[in-house]
Amino acid sequence: RREAQHNEMNTMFAKKALLGAAAALTVLTLAGCSTPDSHEPADLQDFREMVSPKVSWTASVGESDGYLTPAVTENAVYAAGGSSLYRLDRHTGDKVWEAEAGSRIVAGVGTDGMHQAVVTDRGEVEVYDAEGKFIWRATLSAETDVPPLVGQGLVVVKTSDTRITAFDIVTGERRWHYQGQAPALTLQAFNQMAWSPAGILAGQANGRLLALGLNGKPVFDAVIGQAAGITEVERLIDVVGRPWVDNQLMCAAAFQGNLVCMSSTNGQLVWNAKVDSVTGPVA
């Protein structure tokens, strides 16, 4: 019996010794992996404040877990939160009306000043008139967090399956759709469409800026960023943010790509710069 206990104790000591040696070897290995040349955090650089905004008013419009964006017109601010759509007075922030959507709003608001469009978590686009009265809804082909583009007699929606669909602003009838292509991996980033003299501008996940006419036909397809690298992450080149447009120029930016400015009528290159953007251009 004593001999058995003695052997058991020896076995325990041997196991502890092996564990201790393994731990010591791990520490030595980690120490060998460290380097005295490790990068220290960079010093913060001074910057000059270009704009000093002042709060004119605030208003509560409920909660949001998506990319809900207010739409501003000459006299109104249209905003969404929860399952509600609001019209607020632009100058005072006072609520003019509140409309209840069919379910939680996940994308919006799009407006032309007379019609307001949002997308709900049921995968439906809903349109309301200037008084907040519901007009129509239509089922989409996929989910989206991109605000609808409203105007020119159309409500245009871009969905996650790279489809762009246009509906009649009055009846909700589908006018046309355009099917794009996307790489295997795309960036989850804020994105919006815009009107331009060339038509509807829509940034694509393949690093291109697409312009569609009011009939849904491509006007041009401009390269903003080109994929480079080996991994899918290194090759992310989504066009991000909202294209900036005036009568002469339109500019767009791509993640890990370029800032490109083109003629707003034909898409011909004016200038570009190597800029890695996650928000898009603002002027």
Go through each PLM region and give its residues:
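Bacterial N-terminal signal peptides that target proteins for export
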Residues: 7-21
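C-terminal motif of bacterial Sec signal peptides marking the signal peptidase cleavage site
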Residues: 29-32
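Beta-propeller domains
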Residues: 80-91
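Structural signature of WD-repeat beta-propellers
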Residues: 80-82, 120-121, 159-160, 204-205, ...
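Short loop/turn segments that connect beta-strands within beta-propeller blades
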Residues: 89-92, 129-133, 168-172, 213-217, ...
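Conserved beta-propeller blade signature
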Residues: 76-79, 116-118, 155-157, 165, ...
